[in-house]
Curated annotation (Swiss-Prot):
Protein name: Ribosomal RNA small subunit methyltransferase A
UniProt-annotated location(s): Cytoplasm
Molecular function as annotated in GO: 16S rRNA (adenine(1518)-N(6)/adenine(1519)-N(6))-dimethyltransferase activity; RNA binding
Gene3D superfamilies on file: Ribosomal RNA adenine dimethylase-like, domain 2 (1.10.8.100), Vaccinia Virus protein VP39 (3.40.50.150)
Lineage top rank: taxon: Bacteria
EC number, UniProt record: 2.1.1.182
Catalytic activity line of the entry: adenosine(1518)/adenosine(1519) in 16S rRNA + 4 S-adenosyl-L-methionine = N(6)-dimethyladenosine(1518)/N(6)-dimethyladenosine(1519) in 16S rRNA + 4 S-adenosyl-L-homocysteine + 4 H(+)
Binding locations of S-adenosyl-L-methionine: 27, 29, 54, 75, 100, 125
Enzyme class: transferase
Family annotation (HAMAP family): 16SrRNA_methyltr_A
Cellular compartments per GO CC: cytosol
Source organism (scientific name): Streptococcus pyogenes serotype M3 (strain ATCC BAA-595 / MGAS315)
Length: 290
């Protein structure tokens, strides 16, 4: 019997008197086929260390520990730590860290792996309410994560992996795809969780690029330009740019010059621009003094 078997999950929760906290976005997976599929998608083997975020009662951790060299699982809910000690007692390659992943000193933590030189993959069932902050925190960190295989709300996975000229495409797509390739691996129905969430989930597979997708003069400015271009999705690029930078004659002249330099029409919307287009636009606007 697996931890994820519904009867085992229920017995563990009952034995420990555990009640779900909405503030932690807790939904425990009870489908062993999907758990195996996650491990297969992540291509976990004995030559890989895994960082897991939000192990819950250890359903996914069990599968990871059977395949990986070592698993370091970050759990913010201290009520789950003794439960994990119980459910994972047969594994000597699992470290449970009772800490918020956003506050963890990951540079120090990864040195605690028995073999810290192995490639590191992140595998997680992320709480819906904090998916984006966790992802961007990890992606922008200097930790050498090779790959992310992460379960999240389907809508967010679609936004991250979206292409230009689609409804889902936006600044989040650009922020992630600048650093990573991103592809939805498969959909996870809401019915396989306890308690069941209101929406379906998706497994998103992301691979870190050797170099960012494009080279830009100023990364912060590039991300700022991409964000402001989607503030009002139905407005033109020109309207979003002037709303942010201002509408004085001097500013408008600089914007016109920057758009001309980048060879981008002011009348299009942000969703029509590729990441490469945004790179050219940001560099051009920087060049004209914005």
């Amino acid at each position: 019997m697996r931890i994820a078997d519904y009867s085992v999950t229920k017995a563990v929760l009952d034995r420990h008197g555990f009640t779900f906290k909405k503030s932690f976005g807790q939904n425990f997976l009870t489908d062993t086929n999907i758990l195996q599929k996650i491990v297969d998608t992540a291509e976990i083997d004995q030559n890989v260390n895994v960082i897991e975020i939000g192990p819950g009662i250890g359903a996914l951790t069990e599968f990871l520990a059977e395949n990986a060299a070592e698993v370091m699982a970050f759990e913010i809910d201290d009520r789950l730590v003794p439960i994990l000690a119980d459910t994972l007692r047969d594994f000597d390659n699992v470290q449970v860290v009772n800490q918020d992943i956003l506050k963890a000193d990951l540079q120090t933590q990864i040195k605690q792996f028995k073999n810290p030189d192995l490639p590191i993959k992140v595998v997680a069932n992320l709480p819906y309410y904090i998916t984006t902050p966790i992802l961007m925190h990890l992606i922008e960190s200097k930790i050498p994560f090779q790959e992310f295989v992460v379960m999240m709300q389907r809508e967010v996975a679609d936004r991250i992996s979206a292409e230009p000229n689609t409804k889902a495409y936006g600044s989040l797509s650009i922020a992630v795809q600048y650093y990573m390739t991103a592809k939805v691996a498969f959909i996870v129905p809401r019915t396989v969780f306890v308690p069941a969430p209101n929406v379906d989930s998706a497994i998103l597979k992301m691979m870190r690029r050797d170099q960012p997708l494009i080279e830009v003069k100023d990364e912060d400015f590039f991300f700022r330009v991409s964000r402001l271009s989607f503030v009002h999705r139905r407005k033109t690029l020109w309207n979003n740019l002037t709303s942010h930078f201002g509408k004085s004659e001097d500013i408008k002249a600089k914007l016109e010059k920057g758009l001309a330099l980048a060879d981008i029409k002011s009348s299009i919307r942000g969703e029509a621009l590729s990441i490469q287009d945004f790179g050219k636009l940001a560099d051009a606007l920087k060049e004209v003094g914005l």
